[in-house]
Swiss-Prot record:
Keyword vocabulary terms for this entry: Cell cycle, Cell division, Chromosome partition, Cytoplasm, DNA integration, DNA recombination, DNA-binding
The encoding gene: xerC
Tyr recombinase domain boundaries: 105-286
GO cellular component term of the entry, any: cytoplasm
Record-annotated active site: 145, 169, 238, 241, 264, 273
Name of the protein in its database record: Tyrosine recombinase XerC
Organism: Staphylococcus aureus
GO biological process: cell division; chromosome segregation; DNA transposition
Family, per entry: Belongs to the 'phage' integrase family. XerC subfamily.
Protein's cellular compartments: Cytoplasm
Length: 298
């Protein structure tokens, strides 16, 4: 990887506050692109539009999904946009490349019953459960990203206003409220989780050694909770974010409020959460439609 690509990744990390997971995706995209350059004996600074079209064909020949191809092309377009800010002689070969539209999908989310089962798993006040519960509570109660969670400092928690200040994408701060259950889990954690009482830093969420937890560590914790919970097959940080948004909208929250809570710049990004479960659809239908039920039915 050359110095331009390394500087590009560093800019995404420092200035745009991208998560480890997102940065890894960008890095993988660049590595694959570099393999193509080497294979075709091409150079980054002389790469042309026709080469970009050939690269698009190359990705299709590797049987990648449209979403993956779209992301990889977007990564390279953004790379060249960054490079153009440093060198006026650089031309973006991907700027006019028509790449496939992303496949539409409905975000996965957990049912309320599944969430209750997960919280039941970590309700006993062991040292590990104190930490695991605060992770689960914060992700579900606030809908924050895992990259935002691992960077929360103890001073970011406001018990007076019942909320937390997080640093989101683009280094933008936002305040997100939390409820009584989340507050209680944080208080219990701060009071009884021994590693946090003896650590020499301000990070809120720690591993069992008293070190600031990583994004990978959070995923490991959630996977472990799932293994201990009957009837729940999968949970990950972004699924909890989907669940947070879906449950709010299902209970009548307006889209603009959810947009603000999630830290989305565009309302269209939040719009993908407006799906509701079949159970919720049926409940609304039965309660709202005048001919949904006969008079003797309840």
């Amino acid at each position: 990887m050359n110095h331009i690509q390394e500087a590009f990744l560093n800019t995404l990390k420092v200035e745009r506050n991208f998560s480890e997971h997102t940065l890894k995706s960008y890095q993988d995209d660049l590595i694959q692109f570099n393999q193509f350059l080497e294979q075709e004996h091409l150079q980054l600074n002389t790469f042309e539009y026709r080469d970009a079209r050939n690269y698009l064909s190359y990705l299709y020949l590797n049987h990648l999904k449209r979403t993956s191809v779209s992301r990889k092309i977007s990564t390279l377009r953004t790379l060249y946009e960054y490079w153009m800010t440093l060198d006026e002689n650089i031309i973006n070969p991907f700027v006019h490349l028509v790449h496939p539209k992303k496949e539409k999908y409905l975000p996965q989310f957990s049912l309320e019953e599944e969430m209750e089962a997960l919280f039941t798993t970590v309700e006993k006040d062991t040292s590990k459960n104190l930490r695991d519960r605060v992770i689960l509570e914060l992700l579900y109660a606030t809908g924050i990203r895992v990259s935002e969670l691992v960077n929360i400092k103890k001073q970011d928690i406001d018990f007076y206003a019942n909320g937390v200040t997080v640093l989101g994408k683009g280094s933008k701060e936002r305040f997100v409220p939390f409820g009584a259950y989340c507050r209680q889990s944080i208080e219990n954690y701060l009071e009884h989780f021994k590693p946090i009482q003896s650590c020499n830093h301000d990070f809120l969420i720690l591993n069992m050694k008293g070190e600031a937890i990583t994004e990978r560590g959070v995923r490991y914790v959630l996977n472990d909770i799932v293994k201990r919970t009957a009837g729940v097959s999968e949970i990950h940080p972004h699924k909890l974010r989907h669940t947070f948004a879906t449950h709010l909208l299902n209970q009548g929250a307006d889209l603009r409020t959810v947009q603000s809570l999630l830290g989305h710049v565009n309302l269209s990004t939040t719009g993908k959460y407006t799906h509701v479960s079949n159970q919720q659809l049926r409940k609304v239908y039965l309660n709202a439609h005048p001919r949904a039920k006969k008079e003797n039915e309840t």
